Amino acid sequence: MKFTRTLVLASTSLLATVATSQAQEVKRDTKKQGEVVLKPITIISHGKDNIEATGGTVLTYKDIEKLQPANVSELFSRQSSIAVSGGGGPSKRIHVLGMEQSNLAVSVDGVPQTATSWHHTGSNVIDPAFLKRVEVEAGAAAADSGFGAAAGAIRYETVNALDLLEPGKTFGARIIGSYGTNGRGFSGSTAAYGLKDGFDWLLMLHGTSGHNYKNGDGTEILGTEPAARNILGKAGYEFDGNRIDIGYERSRDKADRLIKMNMGLPGDTEYPLEVARDSVNIKYTRTDATDMWDPEVQLYYNRNDYWRNDYQNRTNGNMILKEDLYGGKLQNTFTIDYGKITAGIDFGKHDYNTDNYGHNDRRYRKFNTQQVGAFTQGRFEFDNGFSLSTGARYDYSRFADWNDEVFSDSGASVNGTLSYKFNEHIEVFAGASRTWLGYVLGDYGYVHARNNAFYTDPTFSPGRARNYKAGVNFGGADWSAGITLFDTRIAGLPNYDSQKLGNDPEEYRSRGFTLNARYIWNYTTIGATFTKAKVTAGDDPVLPNSGSFMPIGDMATLFIDQEIPDYNMKVGATLAWAGRISDEAATAANFYDQPAYTVVNAYAEWNPPAVKNMTLRVGVENLFNENYYERTSFAPSQNRGGIDPVWAPGRTFTFQTAFKF
């Protein structure tokens, strides 16, 4: 019955896509040339989704340049819907509306990324120094967002030579150096890029070196020293209307870290840890695409390694984890009078390898998953005020476990978002999706502590998700505002108990609303966001144990940016607030209440008139030296003799100089 209902929904979505061929013409953009306005509030614009219009987040290159983020906490510091837990780089976990990013389809330059490997490590993330754009599509994600988009999608996009080259130039270089107090130490980034005879290339290096930071009370937080060593390389070639792009990203973090990076245990000790990530991809597109022929072909390979030395004679995080993910995508986009339709196939294989140094009766485990899917997504904008984004995909999933037991199944996913624009200032929308997730392995690192008898339950089944959202957008030439109500439910997730891998019986749910507003006046931009979310497992609130689902309660941000062109200056500030969290379930599980906190960051930037290619910047994080731990961190607890959170850094100044040639 469940499959039949899903098939009916998928068929309805596909029929809606086809039926729009009889619809009216798309509404044309009537904005006057040179007029300064915010992005239109409509959910569809020129055949593309407007992520922000449905409660999502978009960070442009200009946004990222303003923030100059040293880590992902600073990258998302202006987004109340996104929480990042504290600690050193490899320990940071990203939660969207209280759901860890592994529940979303995460990609870098279109390449799918692996999920979080172990519940005591951070989310797999890219170096913010390489980014030019980030999109966070919360809730109902499009069918072409990728496989397994249970709670939405996160799309990271890195810079290339064409983004950095000055107009009319064929070669350029950029050097950025900074020094930070409170353990931040030195950070350096260099980039060279060029263009010649249709060939463009870029090479960028970024490294950090520092010490453990101190929290607002002056206590050193172990295992938090910056230790990134990252490389980004890209090349593109255009010929006869064809374009080929090749990209390589290398990430290394090697330092002494806590046994369990997301929590402070009594008598905690640091041990060497290396986290490595390598990604290679090649993509083919057309520069002379037509309405009926706009192809994209992509192949990729990702490798993620977690290595920790054998520091004790039992399983406790001393292990080796290796993942290989490879696959590809073939799609074509059709442009018609009223929008665009994208259709294609994607596929991937994910290999897992674990080594626990022989601290139980099985040292090594190898297992894998495979996926093949077909998808279509249509995005339409009509002159009667309606816009529609709808699509479907069908996937096959296969799981072969460490005992050579094989599980396979297939399922359909469907999504749709419909909006109506009353006038140029008001738009309402509603959307829903039902997503088939295949076999979800989640934090597979659990198996390092399981013995040889550990097996997969024969009834182990694929996961599934449902998303609902609705809202209203308001806007004008210099202001915008919106409210989005959301409800996400995910079931069929894995449960690694002491005897077997099976399905978690609980349905996890995040529901609530987000608010956003922005106003632009001459050289001043003011913005604010607010998020209220209730995250539950079954009927109970989730526990603040740094899991895949975390309580976030009420969170808000307020920011301002001011340009001072007469002095070649820019200044800005961000305020982030999180409300107090207290619930009976957490108290019964020996967690303390989570106190409210308010944190202020600020920056000032200057371009000396005598040296136009130089920028000087000073920034301060946690201006008032608040002693706090970021929401979604492991909360303090009486368990295990007393658990402390990984406290966030106290006041930290950063001084930066940048040259561009």
UniProtKB/Swiss-Prot annotation:
Induction: Induced in absence of iron. One of its GO terms (cellular component) is cell outer membrane. It is found in: Cell outer membrane. Keywords: Cell outer membrane, Membrane, Receptor, Signal, TonB box, Transmembrane, Transmembrane beta strand, Transport. It is a multi-pass membrane protein. One of its GO terms (molecular function) is siderophore uptake transmembrane transporter activity. Pfam families: Plug (PF07715), TonB_dep_Rec_b-barrel (PF00593). Residues 48-159 form the TBDR plug domain. Its main location: membrane. Residues 1-23 form the signal peptide. Residues 170-661 form the TBDR beta-barrel domain. Belongs to the TonB-dependent receptor family. PANTHER family: HEME_HEMOPEXIN UTILIZATION PROTEIN C, TONB-DEPENDENT OUTER MEMBRANE RECEPTOR. Heme transporter. This is Heme transporter BhuA. It comes from Brucella ovis (strain ATCC 25840 / 63/290 / NCTC 10512). The gene is bhuA.
